[in-house]
């Protein structure tokens, strides 16, 4: 799976290829979120929305977080496309995707939505208006969802009575014990009855970590977790640098928008992933790869003193200038 991430670094060399990659990502996940949103509306939210079988996002929780990660990319495509009907379609996709997240009845996704909503509000220039709209939208959704959804969301406050939540806490403690005993962790196949009998507080609750952080901690130890967090932190820094470099450059507005939306995707992953085993899911690694490409392009042009308007995601002025950055961009 991770081979495709390296191919992203090698093959994505211009605006057209990067936008095509984003379209593939959006359509791959958006297909399931679109029909999931329709399903939720037709059934009144009485059933869970699941992803494609035998995939990383087959369960409802994983699909919901993946949808939250893709929705900012939908916003990016909505903003850059010049075609009216494509914008209408992307607007509908955003609406149904949001509904599908609620329809997943995922408690982790609810927390991720809160984190994403707060980040959007924090970065908004019209905080009063955006805050009002967020409250109205949340109120409408809460009124629409059935009692079973409300009961499941309220169980967040009474996690001690939830067997699933207590199993996760048992697995998290197992991860800490393994990392404390083994410098580089116990490997990818450590989630077994034999290992839980040695390291878990309750050896009878053999359960996956359901957390990107504790999963990496058990698999690779404290060193692996530090490296994992460092990669996420560096990706965030790359995007922040792109945002700063393109802030006052109208010709680089698309790069600025993409960097900001990728940060929202990372917020969704880091918050929602705290309760899901998606450490090796390829989507966040593609986002990290794109952040490397964007930052490398701007950093290299600053070093050689070139005009930033020839960035990988430049704002097109004319067909002749639209694909000026055809020069191969080596991976970072």
Descriptions of predicted regions:
Residues 1-7, 13, 17-49, 55-123, ...:
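Alpha-helical transmembrane segments of multi-pass inner-membrane proteins
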Residues 46-54, 157-173, 177-220, 241-255, ...:
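Long extracytoplasmic/lumenal interhelical loops at the membrane interface
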Residues 60, 122-125, 220-224, 265, ...:
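Loop-to-transmembrane-helix entry motif
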Residues 129, 220-266, 286, 290-291, ...:
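Hydrophobic transmembrane alpha-helices and their immediate junctions
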Residues 135-136, 234, 264-322:
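Transmembrane alpha-helices of multi-pass inner-membrane enzymes
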Residues 241-257, 303-332:
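Membrane-interfacial, low-structure loops and terminal tails that flank and connect transmembrane helices
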């Amino acid at each position: 799976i991770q081979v495709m991430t390296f191919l992203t670094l090698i093959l994505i060399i211009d605006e057209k290829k990067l936008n095509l990659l984003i379209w593939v990502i959006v359509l791959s996940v958006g297909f399931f979120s679109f029909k999931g949103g329709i399903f939720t509306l037709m059934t009144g939210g009485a059933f869970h929305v699941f992803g494609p079988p035998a995939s990383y996002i087959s369960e409802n929780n994983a699909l919901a977080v993946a949808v939250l990660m893709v929705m900012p990319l939908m916003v990016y495509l909505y903003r850059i496309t010049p075609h009216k009907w494509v914008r209408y379609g992307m607007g509908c996709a955003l609406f149904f995707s949001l509904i599908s997240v609620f329809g997943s009845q995922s408690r982790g996704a609810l927390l991720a939505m809160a984190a994403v909503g707060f980040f959007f509000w924090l970065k908004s220039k019209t905080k009063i208006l955006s805050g009002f709209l967020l409250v109205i939208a949340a109120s409408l959704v809460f009124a629409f969802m059935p009692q079973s959804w409300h009961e499941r969301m309220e169980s967040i406050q009474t996690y001690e009575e939830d067997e699933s939540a207590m199993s996760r806490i048992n697995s998290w403690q197992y991860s800490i014990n393994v990392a404390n005993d083994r410098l580089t962790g116990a490997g990818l196949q450590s989630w077994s009855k034999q290992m839980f009998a040695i390291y878990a507080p309750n050896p009878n609750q053999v359960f996956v970590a359901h957390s990107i952080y504790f999963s990496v901690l058990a698999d690779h130890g404290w060193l692996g977790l530090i490296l994992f967090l460092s990669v996420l932190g560096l990706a965030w820094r790359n995007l922040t640098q792109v945002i700063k470099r393109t802030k006052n450059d109208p010709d680089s507005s698309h790069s600025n928008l993409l960097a900001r939306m990728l940060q929202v995707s990372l917020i969704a992953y880091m918050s929602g992933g705290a309760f899901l085993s998606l450490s090796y899911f390829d989507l966040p690694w593609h986002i990290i790869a794109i952040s490397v490409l964007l930052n490398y392009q701007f950093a290299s042009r600053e070093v050689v003193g070139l005009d930033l308007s020839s960035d990988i995601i430049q704002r097109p002025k004319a067909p002749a200038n639209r694909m000026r950055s055809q020069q191969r961009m080596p991976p970072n």
